[in-house]
Structure formats: C-alpha cells, structure tokens
Amino acid sequence: MITLYNTLTRQKEVFKPIEPGKVKMYVCGPTVYNYIHIGNARPAINYDVVRRYFEYQGYNVEYVSNFTDVDDKLIKRSQELNQTVPEIAEKYIAAFHEDVGALNVRKATSNPRVMDHMDDIIQFIKDLVDQGYAYESGGDVYFRTRKFEGYGKLSHQSIDDLKVGARIDAGEHKEDALDFTLWKKAKPGEISWDSPFGEGRPGWHIECSVMAFHELGPTIDIHAGGSDLQFPHHENEIAQSEAHNHAPFSNYWMHNGFINIDNEKMSKSLGNFILVHDIIKEVDPDVLRFFMISVHYRSPINYNLELVESARSGLERIRNSYQLIEERAQIATNIENQQTYIDQIDAILNRFETVMNDDFNTANAITAWYDLAKLANKYVLENTTSTEVIDKFKAVYQIFSDVLGVPLKSKNADELLDEDVEKLIEERNEARKNKDFARADEIRDMLKSQNIILEDTPQGVRFKRG
C-alpha cells in the first residue's frame, strides 16, 4: 500500500488510482532556452524514482512531461543568438535528453510540446471565454480568477489575502488585479499565431493545462513539480482545468524541495548556477543521481563537493560489496543450513518496501541498501558461499538498483579493484593452508577469467593484469 504526501490536503494519503493498476502522471518539464541546471535535474530524478517504484509494484505508469518551447525567455534567447525560437528549442530539447539520459532518467511516455498543441490551446481558451471564465481585453485574454470558487486551495491561501499586493501593470487591461493571462497579444518581431482573439501566443499556465488534458484526460492521478511551481503556476492550472473540464484536475499533488549551493540559494547573480551539462563532466552522473536521492524528495538539499564526495564513497561501498557477491557466485556451491541469511535479506527488502511505500523515502531506502551491503560483506568473509544465498543477494541488489535507478556497476568498472583481488588472494592462501586445494584452484581460475595472473615470489603471492 503506497502512501504519498498530497500538497492539496497537506497530509499523507493512501494512493488510489483512477483506473486500477494504472497511474496517470504529469510532471512539469523545462523551458528549453538553455541547458538544464541541477535544480531542474532534481524533479527529473525524484519523479523517475516514483515512476520506477510504481512499476515495481505492478502499476502501468503513463508518464507525461512537457517541453515549454515558446516563452519570453526563448524569445529573448532567439533574439540574442539571431536564431529562430524553434531552432533554440530543438537544440536544448536534444541537450535535455542527453543530460537526463546520463542521469539514468527513463524516457517519458510522452513529451508534448506547446507548439504542437497550439490549436488545442486556442480552442481551450475559447471554451473558457464562452463559459464566462475568461475575457478578451486589448488583444490579451485573461482568466477571471474570482469566478473560480476554489482558487487558492493548493497553496492554501485565501483570495482576499492574495488581493493584497496584487497590481495591474501598465498596458494591462484586467478587470481584476488577480486575473492572469491566457493569451498574450503579439509584439512586433515576436513569434505569434492567429486566433479568434488576434495574433499572439499563449500564457505559461494554460499550456500545461491543455497538454495534460490532451495527453491524460480531464482528471489525472498525480501532478508533480518543484515547490516553486506550487503558486502561481499549479494554482492557475487547477483553476483553468477545473473551470474547463468540470472535474478535479489532479487527485494528488507532489512537490520536491529546493537545491541550495553551499547553503545559498542557487542564482546567476551569485555565480553559483550549476548546469548539468557542465557538472557531469566532473562528477560521475551515477554519483550525482545517488546524491540527489540521498535526501527525501520533499526536503531541501544542499549541494557541495564534500557531500557529493560522501555520496561517491557510499555508492562505491555498495558497488564493491556487490562485486564481491558476483565474484563468489562463480565459486558458490549448494550448501544448506544458511536460511538465516535468506531471512535477513528478506527483512532488508521488506524494510526497503516499507520506507518506499511511505511517501517514497529514498533516504531510508538507501540506508536499507547500505545494510544489505554490510550483510553481504559479512556473509562473504565468514561463510562458505551458498548458491541460494548468493542468488538472493544478487536479486535484491538488482531490485534496489532498478527502483532507485542507480547502476550496480560504473560505466568503466569492468575490472576488479586491486583491494578486492588482494582479499581473494588472502582467501586462496587460507584455503591452501587448510589443504582445500579445490577452493584454491577455483579462486585462481576465477581470477584468470578476469585476466589476473597470480605469481609465487619469495615475498608471497603477487598478481598482474594480463
């Protein structure tokens, strides 16, 4: 039974899908005017884990994440580079796929783009105008915020409180300062589309409402994104969608915490703006992913090199222990009376599932993985290895790897580490001392299969790589 924290109700709730066995999930994607920064990477990784865990539990997940490919930032960038908006968007959509692919984020079921849904957006806005929820003024179209009775329910703000501080900017023709833009009148030299309201382009909020409706229907199971999107973006999505569809927009809302850089907010003005495109040249992408999930998704996370190094060390411990298990698989035998280890492995797996069922607590899930690695090391050092136990270890390691999306081997780690070879040599020496020559030969042959040659010298056994 999976429970998740629902921002809408401010409490953990048991997940109940609209359709049994299926999850319809929409995650707000990036505005593709630049390479993504690590703040964009966090939701991509966190909600990839959510998706993976639902799939592990047998659900069919329809995972939709959009690209905003027309926006003020894109228009400004196209003017700076003297390129078209579509050219800019194509470049950074390709870069996004490359960056999140390096972070082992699975491809979405669908990545809708705003430009591909322009007719749908225009029709959606027209429907809202026809229903009295929106109005055209001076070539712009605005949403009548006060007409939607539930406005503020996601961010838990009253509309009267929101009124304080709201203002109408010069050039706007709103009925109310709280009304927000659905359609922007075209400006000279900007990309635009023809519509019943005149030449222009959509506002940011309407885009996600329309793409979610087109891809997943009037009501979805889970809508997710960063905490910064809760208000006004997601609040406005609810207003537009529920006014248009006459149905709840999303049953569950998930929001991940912010990323700070050395305990400071990430910003270009502070010079601490970190692009994934750059950082994965210096930090192993697997380590970066492991670091991101080492903290619960709703909590803020602090990025610094010391913490990243700690994540690297932790992942290395897990991988080293798995490597020992793989090595022992080659010399394991059918030994009975090791049920205690099977039971301990099952207990760790049960704990992993328990913490993941509790709002996808990856921090505690990683603790369970560390405990599995500790048990594996103890087992290998203290026991003659059983095929049954080794296979059980491998199966649970693979589950943890698949759910958390962290590979069990680094991309360039096909070779045994020197320290692991030394441990095997010590074990072989002990086997020879005990006249267990069969085991000694098995270890020698296993090392040979890894192109590691043992040499007897007056100083003891040494090895070299073939």
Swiss-Prot record:
It catalyses: tRNA(Cys) + L-cysteine + ATP = L-cysteinyl-tRNA(Cys) + AMP + diphosphate. SMART domains: DALR_2. SUPFAM superfamilies: Anticodon-binding domain of a subclass of class I aminoacyl-tRNA synthetases, Nucleotidylyl transferase. Binds 1 zinc ion per subunit. InterPro entries: Cys-tRNA-ligase (IPR015803), Cys-tRNA-synt_Ia_DALR (IPR015273), Cys-tRNA/MSH_ligase (IPR024909), CysS_C (IPR056411), Rossmann-like_a/b/a_fold (IPR014729), tRNA-synt_1_cat_dom (IPR032678), tRNAsynth_Ia_anticodon-bd (IPR009080). Keywords: Aminoacyl-tRNA synthetase, ATP-binding, Cytoplasm, Ligase, Metal-binding, Nucleotide-binding, Protein biosynthesis, Zinc. Its cofactor is Zn(2+). ATP binds at K268. Zn(2+) binds at C28, C208, H233, E237. One of its GO terms (cellular component) is cytosol. A motif ('HIGH' region) lies at residues 30-40. Its EC number is 6.1.1.16. One of its GO terms (molecular function) is ATP binding. Belongs to the class-I aminoacyl-tRNA synthetase family. This is Cysteine--tRNA ligase.
